[in-house]
């Protein structure tokens, strides 16, 4: 059997996949990702764990001088990162840590993080996430939540008394 042929195993070549590119309106955030798990058949909206896959794998490329995403945390998701090439830094709850090729780090649910490339060449990372059902994400700098239903939505609210609207 050749590459990609069915034997119960799925195979893709990441060099043949088209990266998803993004940039924020003012250009502060930019990046591109190769969604390996989705190319292997992962169905992110499914609640069937066989269709969702137990984890998601991405190759994330961050251009020089950019961060791919705002500073954020996840309500239930773990994320593992491995720097494949380039260098940069990661902002986290305790400060900022420099990263270089070969470094790996993990963030558990509730730990805010943001990667940025302070080098002159692209920073490339492998990202592995467990993508649990019911995940939401929080952006501490802008005090808003991201929720996946019905589509990705961002919301912001002010603190309310526990009984507000109940009596």
Regions flagged by a language model, labelled:
Residues 70, 91-93, 116, 126:
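Beta-strand residues in well-ordered beta-sheet regions across diverse protein folds
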Residues 39-45, 58-74, 109:
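Conserved short histidine dyad/triad with adjacent acidic residue
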Residues 33, 54-59, 112, 122:
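Conserved beta-strand residues within beta-sheet cores
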Residues 54-55, 59-63, 73-92, 129-130:
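Short, conserved beta-strand element in jelly-roll/cupin
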Residues 1-54, 136, 141-167:
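A short, N-terminal "cap"/entry segment at the start of jelly-roll beta-barrel domains
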Residues 109-135:
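Ligand-binding loop in jelly-roll beta-barrel domains
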Residues 94-109:
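Short acidic-glycine-tyrosine-enriched beta hairpin
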